[in-house]
Swiss-Prot record:
Monomer. Associates with 30S ribosomal subunit, binds 16S rRNA. Binds 1 zinc ion per subunit. One of its GO terms (cellular component) is cytoplasm. It comes from Aquifex aeolicus (strain VF5). Pfam families: RsgA_GTPase. The gene is rsgA. GTP binds at residues 118-121, 172-180. Keywords: Cytoplasm, GTP-binding, Hydrolase, Metal-binding, Nucleotide-binding, Ribosome biogenesis, RNA-binding, rRNA-binding, Zinc. This is Small ribosomal subunit biogenesis GTPase RsgA. It comes from the Bacteria. The keyword Aminoacyl-tRNA synthetase does not apply. It is an enzyme of class 3 (hydrolase). CDD domains: YjeQ_EngC. One of its GO terms (molecular function) is metal ion binding.
Length: 302
């Protein structure tokens, strides 16, 4: 049977031995049953695009799994188009270093981040000006930034439109309102409230991930990504510079420039000229410093 005769679906539920497949042809979710080489060789995850056939009114036989463009580990979802990094200017207070770490990590996993500032209904005029400054910094760095209030609904329609056709997950610090945003998008709540990079656990932890449809062809995971993460968990010291996307616009004197103390560093010159945000550059230096401190600690243990 050729692929043209098979039907295309998306794995939207993966827990233990249970697989749920959303069939694009009819918008119905079926119980997925792998067979043939898929059964023997392929580890199926939420977010996988699959091909197969409906064998009864409730069952979809999976014949093939498409090659993935990415696979996250928190949560374990394939083919993620956008990670919605939720932040707030206050309650909790914004920490650009934590955001910059998270941006490095998702750049490493080849997932496009979008920064969403929630709780804008709480801001006074001075705070709104500061939010506009943060907006400008991250837009200039090359990121999309949206501003919403999950409480009032302001900006939610724009977020839904922006995410049209994408597979998404939510990430961001504790208390920023990830569950409230998910509820606005889908009418449902997050099953796992937070995930820590240390414990790898959250309240009401589940072993699987469910992708919930919303908007026009969009899906969002009901289990969040990292609430806090250090880039050092994944990225090698020399690679950090490659994940600050605004740095890539500049040509330094030396190809292996670390943008720290080398002469002829175009990145440092750009910081000096105001072309690169001082806050972003300080985050970069702090991440490098974390590496150095970790190496020193390892040497002490040895």
């Amino acid at each position: 049977m050729g692929k043209k005769e098979l039907k295309r679906g998306l794995v939207v539920d993966r827990e233990a031995q249970m697989i749920g497949v959303y069939l694009f042809e009819d918008g119905k979710t079926y119980r997925g049953i792998p067979r043939g080489k898929v059964l023997k060789k392929t580890k199926i995850n939420a977010g996988d695009y699959v091909w197969g056939e409906v064998v009864d009114p409730n069952t979809f036989a999976i014949e093939e799994v498409e090659e993935r463009k990415n696979l996250l580990i928190r949560p374990k979802v394939a083919n993620v188009d956008r990670v919605i990094i939720v932040e707030t200017l206050k309650m909790p207070e914004f920490n650009n270093y934590l955001l910059d770490n998270m941006l490095v990590v998702y750049e490493y996993f080849k997932v496009e981040p979008v920064i969403v500032f929630n709780k804008i209904d709480l801001l006074n005029e001075e705070e709104k000006k500061e939010l506009e400054r943060m907006d400008s910094i991250y837009r200039d760095a090359g990121y999309d930034v949206l501003k919403v209030s999950a409480k009032t609904g302001e900006g939610i329609d724009e977020l839904v439109d922006y995410l049209e056709g994408f597979i998404c997950i939510l990430a961001g610090p504790s208390g920023v309102g990830k569950s409230s945003i998910l509820s606005r998008l889908t009418g449902e709540e997050l099953r796992t409230q937070e995930v820590s990079e240390k414990t790898e656990r959250g309240r009401h932890t589940t072993t699987g991930v469910r992708l919930i449809p919303f908007g026009k062809g969009s899906f969002v995971g009901d289990t969040p990504g990292f609430s806090k993460v250090e880039a050092t968990m994944f990225v090698k010291p020399r690679e950090v510079r490659n994940y600050f996307r605004e740095f890539l616009r500049y040509q330094c004197k030396y190809p292996d420039c670390t943008h720290t103390n080398e002469p002829g560093c175009a990145v440092k010159e750009a910081v000096k000229n105001g072309e690169i945000s001082c806050e972003r550059y300080k985050s970069y230096l702090k991440i490098i410093k974390v590496y150095l401190e970790e190496i020193k600690e390892l040497c002490r243990e040895d």
